Amino acid sequence: ITGAEAMMRSLEHQGVTTIFGYPGGSIMPVFDALYDHQNTLNHILVRHEQGAAHAAQGFARVSGEVGVCLVTSGPGATNTITGIADAMIDSTPIVVIAGQVGTGFLGTDAFQEVDLVGITQPIAKWSYQIRRAEDVAWAVARAFYIARSGRPGPVVLDFAKDAQNAKTKYEPAKLDFIRSYVPVPDTDEDSVKEAAELINNAERPLVLVGQGVELGNAQSELRAFIEKADMPAGCTLLGLSALPTDHPLNKGMLGMHGNLGPNINTNKCDVLIAVGMRFDDRVTGNLATYAKQAKVIHFDIDPAEVNKNVKVDIAVLGDCKNTLAAVTGLLKENKHTEWNDSFKEYEKVEEEKVIRPELYPATDSLTMGEVARAVSEATHHEAVLVTDVGQNQMISARYFKYSKERSIITSGGLGTMGFGLPAAIGATFGAPERTVCVFMGDGGLQMNIQELGTIMEQKAPVKIICLNNNFLGNVRQWQAMFFNRRYSFTPMLNPDYMKIASAYDIPSKRVYSREELKVAIDEMLATDGPFLLEACVIEEGNVLPMTPPGGSVNQMLLEC
């Protein structure tokens, strides 16, 4: 068989069912082979290769499986770079298969030749160029093993065109060990005992829940861990659905636009327990003042994250599904009633100063928060929330509630505008049984708006909620707060989104009032297929609370 056919069989052997891609010259032999595998491999034709990468991310994040995208060389490959970088920083398992010029043309600046391996090595777990057809099965097995094992991430396969056409004998390859690669470090038993002892003696423990809990499918272990010791928990943006919002020990969201309680009490706890999170700057604020009073325990699968940003006292390395269970087995039944009650005063202040004005505003105009909460309630808090980046991201994350696992998909570390729409498409294929709602701003919607064509063709049931404030809202908020309201190129003149939706044969509705909003949400959710809901919200609405740039987590601003 050809190398291209070997690629198809190798993908099937890995359990792949869905591919997001865009054909072109240097990948045509693979697409020709794909023509005969349409019964087993569902190819989704995107409208831009960046959309393919983000769709693969959305598929992976909601399903826990490896997302796959297939593109051509040159601009096709470079168009995936943002998605690869996004997947790397957010630990998302995807495999990007790109065509490449024939081996005889490498290094000659041939048509649509780029050094994809060189470009992607810093932003991928592994980048490899396939130059021989006989290497296909091995390379694919290695790629999927690396992408999904340990701390997940993106892998790039650069597939030379002559290797696609060359003949080879195919044998399925299985790989579960690479000598130079240790995906899960050994857990030190002493660290488990020390962590348990420190927690047992803590008076004010606080657990920080990251996406690693979901990546490790450790949600039930997390609940057992915090419940046994009666420990309050705060969730990072990517970890929000690892613990149900209404769980009594869930104190809310961490970070720059998170909730007061878990942020301020980070600097009041005596033991800080981080689980599957990396202490990024959006969570810590000013590191010089971050949790200096606390002993720090860090559960993580990646040794590189330990002591990178925050000095830890005990590192518990390994898969958190196993390490949490091990530590929980050594914990004493405990109660921290007074400590848990201390969060209530912050909840009361935030409710009065921020939440009520956002959800029950005095103005007739819609706020971003009330739109998000209304959609969450209408879906019984069971929808998959996909967000773009900006105010829409922070506001929907704050006001959505999460009752199911793997319910938030967003660009966390890279902050990629244009992520939301294609990621939502991927999510509908990764979890077809669930309602997928994507919140976007009027800025981000236009960054990959061409993917409405993919939605139209696939009839993907994406529920698109555009929060239209005629601004690049997040940047405008910073300009208002820190740049004397000098709105430098943040006001936006927008197209008529209703006409755009109509052109793509997507039902749509524009709303200005609360009465219109309720009717439109009901119509959106009753529609079998995609729907675009444009909510015209207060133009200069802000996302609060907010940790100011360079500020500490206990210096959150409640007003602009």
Task: Describe every region a protein language model picked out.
Residues 156, 298, 386, 439-440:
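Generic enzyme active-site microenvironment
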Residues 1-338, 378-381, 461-464, 501:
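N-terminal alpha/beta PP-like core and its mobile active-site loop of ThDP/TPP-dependent enzymes
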Residues 134, 197, 293-389, 514-523, ...:
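Phosphate/pyrophosphate-binding active-site segments
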Residues 4-17, 25, 30-35, 347-427, ...:
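Active-site diphosphate/adenylate-binding microenvironment
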